[in-house]
Amino acid sequence: METDINRLKVVLAEKKRTNKWLCEQLNVNPSTVSKWCTNSSQPDLPTLVKISRLLEVNVDDLLNTKIVDF
């Protein structure tokens, strides 16, 4: 089973942005962004929307839609 819920780390790299940049934009602790990027925890929906706007992508682009658990 795929365990990565979000693709934040991948999208940040594609957009040539860093964790530090994102934490500064969102005014959150760097460890929070690090946890999101490693899928240790997940941003809430309003934060996910903010991230998508900052990175100029759809929210869907930040989510791993291939998670299947049958």
Language-model region placement:
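Short, charged recognition helix plus adjacent turn
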Residues: E2, V10, K15-K16, K35, ...
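Recognition helix of helix-turn-helix/homeodomain-like DNA-binding domains
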Residues: V28-Q42, T65-I67
